[in-house]
Design a protein with these regions (language model features):
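Non-heme di-metal
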Residues: 1-208
Length: 208
């Protein structure tokens, strides 16, 4: 079902450490709109999708988010692996260093640890897919913010641009999945029932 290729989706080769920028990018590792939450969200939601197409989209994107997680963690690692103690102290990286040295650990740019309350798996395909559309836009916005900071550093900006572009593609794929779910609904009111749980004909046809 799945094949792991031992290479990054996009090459990363950062030669100059930068502790301050690493803290910004770290947010896409374990922040509120980061890749850990995205992968867990989609891989959890896939089980209650009402058709194979929507389930496959969630599975494909959820596993790709794991590849993006690998990319973001590689960027953070390369930005911090050769830091001197002077750089750590001057950059404000000290509190992170005390707890994790230069290990990669999931937290937001502000230092808030990752937690699963930052994503949902509601069991309602329409609800979940709308959440996913919003999640991809929030991730794109975060990458936009990062790009404003690193725009003049090509070795960082180039892989970030790649990640941003994939968020746009994911948004489009989730739109396709949402349409496939809505087209299967009998009611023009998409919120009349949960197609993964309720039976819309239960009251009238007694066949469910």
């Amino acid at each position: 079902m799945w094949n792991y290729e031992k290479r990054l989706q996009y090459p990363i080769n950062i030669k100059t450490p930068n502790a301050k920028i690493s803290q910004f990018i770290m947010s896409q590792y374990g922040g509120p709109d980061g890749e850990i939450g995205a992968s867990l969200r989609y891989l959890s939601q896939r089980f209650t999708m009402p058709n194979r197409m929507a389930s496959a989209v969630l599975n494909d994107i959820g596993t790709e988010e794991l590849a993006h997680l690998e990319m973001v963690s590689t960027i953070v690692h390369q930005l911090t692996r050769d830091l001197s103690m002077e750089e750590i102290e001057k950059s404000g990286f000290g509190p992170y260093y005390i707890d994790h040295t230069v290990g990669v650990w999931p937290q937001a740019a502000g230092g808030v640890p990752f937690n699963a309350c930052e994503f949902q798996s509601k069991g309602d395909p329409v609800t979940d897919l709308f959440e996913n559309l919003a999640a991809e836009q929030k991730a794109r916005s975060t990458y936009d913010n990062i790009l404003r900071v690193v725009r003049n550093i090509p070795e960082i900006a180039d892989p970030i641009r790649f990640l941003r572009a994939r968020e746009v593609v994911h948004f489009q794929r989730f739109g396709e999945a949402l349409r496939s779910v809505q087209e299967q609904l009998d009611s023009k009111n998409f919120y009349a029932f949960n197609p993964s749980f309720d039976c819309p004909c239960e009251a009238s046809c007694k066949k469910c």
